[in-house]
Amino acid sequence: MSVQVAAPGSTGLGPERLNPEELVRQTRQVVQGLEALRAEHHSLAGHLAEALAGPGPVAGVELLEEKQQVVNHSLEAIELGLGEAQVLLALSAHVGVLEAEKQRLRAQARRLAQENTWLREELEETQRRLRASEEAVAQLEEEKSHLQFLGQLRQYDPPEESQRPDSPPRRDSLASLFPSEEEEKKGPEAAGAAAAQQGGYEIPARLRTLHNLVIQYASQGRYEVAVPLCRQALEDLERSSGHCHPDVATMLNILALVYRDQNKYKEATELLHDALQIREQTLGPEHPAVAATLNNLAVLYGKRGRYREAEPLCQRALEIREKVLGADHPDVAKQLNNLALLCQNQGKFQDVERHYARALSIYEALGGPQDPNVAKTKNNLASAYLKQNKYQQAEELYKEILSQEALPAPLGAPQGGTAGEAQQQVLRRSSSFSKLRESIRRGSEKLVSRLRGESMAGAAGMKRAMSLNMLNVDGPRAARMQLSTQHLNEASRTLSASTQDLSPR
């Protein structure tokens, strides 16, 4: 006799996929069925035992013993099934506990991960604020020390020309951060001394102070301080005023100045193109600041040897300055000098002579023949004549430069001004005459060498050639020439700012 117990709902065709809850429910039903079968088999085993204990035929006893063995075997199978079912139920309960614990731990891990992310973000924000605070503190300390130093120096300075009622208005501004060739060696104070005079746009004092700091750092070679300082200020301006704002263009010019000093001409050119676009949009295409940026771009292209690209930029800057400032303005003459240098590097000597001649006429009309800019322009024109082998014209220009009977006002006694004012002009022009004298000396050496067919002589021999052979004058004229040369030598030790060639070095 055998009894089979099937799970309710089972078709017997194969295993079915059940979820854990359904499996536990069916296992419990099977346990109940097995317990009922066990009770039934115990009852059968009892009846068989009673039957075997009573008298009966031998054949009947053998049959009863066989049935008893089958029942006992079934009881063993039922007990085994019950044990396995109990184990399954216990395992199911344990798995349920583990699953609940796993879900709890998983939720806790998610919460901890969120808290960790939040803490990381807070830490990064705190570190960023700390770095910004440290940079701000360092910047303020540097600015404080710089301003204290400037304050200590200011008490020894004479009154500035811009503070005297009889002085003409200055047009130096932060709009021209790459000065013209005559202005390139002026100090940072000259570059940031005044606001823009055209279009009603005034450079903020904060940017002028920042520009002075950047110039100071760059002159010391501390570009690792100057560049982050510029970039931080640029980001602050873009956040507060937007990208298309004149102050942003000014800041781009300052950063381009730092890159130019590092000989990173490509990066500086990109920044100046951005500044040019901003100034054209905000100030108009014919604003003096646009002309200054165009001139700066032309200077950069010239330093990179890209003279063809620089020339139209310089030409456009000239047209703007002629229209806004007038055809006889000093800035127009400076622009003509730059344009002449670009043309000279391209071999356009006819244009070079025309531009220098016009610049010379402007300087002579404004300052007379004693204006230092007249001597500089004549020296540049003489150099152009030398490159064309026009030795006679170059000799005449060098004679005019060296034979001036009267020197500029700062070299003699003050005429209608205080000694302090004259000394201030002397200091501003010292490097100008120093470089001019050196340039004239080199040009004269070339001229004498070519005229006489000799090699370049030393400095001592050159002085004799200049006095005896090249000038070829005598009497009072020779004395005046010698006196002028002596004055020019003295000027090289006392006077200031000069031109720089646009050609690459």
UniProtKB/Swiss-Prot annotation:
UniProt-recorded Gene Ontology molecular function terms: kinesin binding; microtubule binding; microtubule motor activity
Which spans of this chain does the record mark as coiled coil? 90-150
Gene3D superfamilies linked to this entry: Tetratricopeptide repeat domain
Tell me the PROSITE patterns matching this sequence: TPR, TPR_REGION
GO biological process: what's one of them? spermatid development
The TPR repeat units are at 207-240, 249-282, 291-324, 333-366, 375-408
Arranged from A to Z, the UniProt key words for this protein are: Coiled coil, Cytoplasm, Cytoskeleton, Differentiation, Microtubule, Mitochondrion, Motor protein, Phosphoprotein, Repeat, Spermatogenesis, TPR repeat
- List where in the cell it is found: Cytoplasm, Cytoskeleton; Mitochondrion
Indicate, by first and last residue, each region the UniProt record lists as having compositional bias (Basic and acidic residues): 161-173
Tell me where in this chain the PTM Phosphothreonine is found.
499
PTM sites of type Phosphoserine: 173, 467, 503
Listed under GO cellular component are: ciliary rootlet; cytoplasm; kinesin complex; microtubule; mitochondrion; motile cilium; neuron projection
Q: For bias kind Polar residues, which ranges apply?
A: 421-434
Q: In which tissues is it expressed?
A: Expressed in postmeiotic male germ cells (at protein level).
Under Pfam families, the record lists: TPR_12 (PF13424)
The answer, when asked if Ribosomal protein is one of the entry's keywords, is no
Spell out the residue ranges making up region: Disordered.
Answer: 1-20, 154-197, 409-439, 486-505
- Give the quaternary structure: Oligomer composed of two heavy chains and two light chains. Associates with microtubulin in an ATP-dependent manner. Interacts with KIF5C. Interacts with ODF1. Interacts with LRGUK. Interacts with VDAC2.
Entry's family note: Belongs to the kinesin light chain family.
What remark about domains does the record contain? The heptad repeat (HR) motif is sufficient for interaction with kinesin heavy (KHL) chains and ODF1. The TPR region is involved in mitochondrial binding.
* Functional description taken from the UniProt entry: Kinesin is a microtubule-associated force-producing protein that may play a role in organelle transport. Plays a role during spermiogenesis in the development of the sperm tail midpiece and in the normal function of spermatozoa. May play a role in the formation of the mitochondrial sheath formation in the developing spermatid midpiece.
Spell out the protein name for this chain.
Answer: Kinesin light chain 3
The species this protein was found in: Rattus norvegicus (Rat)
Q: Which gene encodes it?
A: Klc3
